[in-house]
Amino acid sequence: MSGHSKWHNIQAKKGKTDAKRGKIFTKIGKEIVMAVKNGGANQDINAKLRDVVAKAKAANMPNDTISKAIKKASGELSSVNYENIVYEGYGPSGVAVIVETLTDNKNRSAGNVRSAFTKGGGNMGTSGCVSFMFQEKGEIVIEKEDKDEDELMMIALDAGAEDFASEEEVFVVTTAPEEFGTVREALEAQGIEFLEASVKMIPDTYTAIDEADAKKFQKMLDLLDDDDDVQEVYHNAEFPEGWDE
């Protein structure tokens, strides 16, 4: 089966600066706080927390760090007041961009996100201006190594996955949001580890950008990734072949 994820071309550009700056654990920690606040610290009954923990493990967050984050979240609930705010807009060449934030100061986050759009050659738009170009999907990325493609495909599809794609170095499993946990847990039960596992916004189509616009857009992504309020950035840019900055 063939998918439309283009994971290496699209998602890898977004996430590498998080890892480089050591911010990804902090961002996931905020998601843990919100998951615990909304559903409690027991993973057996809190599906959202299970999903966030899976995302943390895929990002190589140590188990001890995850446990401490959950424990810390349980003790901080009365003082936690993060607000989930989603911004939409356009990058160079009309690239569609969605920015998800968890913030305790929406004026700060709005100003920072708007600045990143402007400095990256784009502009922030109104709510709904680009979200119709995306679909919410679960996405599980698995490194190929020596894994049996047919076996993995059957496990994923039997558990309810919508699609199974073979890309250059990875397999990408796509699910409906409500089936994400079931499919992920079916793969985990077989000892499969993930490069990435989360529910995200996946574009219906992609916009090819040239090298000049790629440089501008990468600046926007770097600024957004470096913002503590920004949790996720989704876009439909297709970078030039071989682009890696």
UniProtKB/Swiss-Prot annotation:
Show the Gene3D superfamilies listed in the entry: 1.10.10.200, 3.30.70.980
Q: Where on the tree of life does the source sit, at the highest rank? A: Bacteria
The main location is cytoplasm
Question: Could you name the Gene Ontology cellular component terms for this entry?
Answer: cytosol
Intrachain S-S bonds: none
| MF term (GO), any | DNA binding
Is DNA-binding among the key words of this record?
yes
The GO biological-process annotations, alphabetized, read as: regulation of DNA-templated transcription
Instruction: Give the location in the cell.
Output: Cytoplasm
Keywords associated with the record = Cytoplasm, DNA-binding, Transcription, Transcription regulation
Q: Which family does it belong to?
A: Belongs to the TACO1 family.
Q: Please identify the protein, giving its name as recorded.
A: Probable transcriptional regulatory protein Cbei_4222
Q: Which organism is it from?
A: Clostridium beijerinckii (strain ATCC 51743 / NCIMB 8052) (Clostridium acetobutylicum)
Give the source lineage, highest ranks first. Answer: Bacteria, Bacillati, Bacillota, Clostridia, Eubacteriales
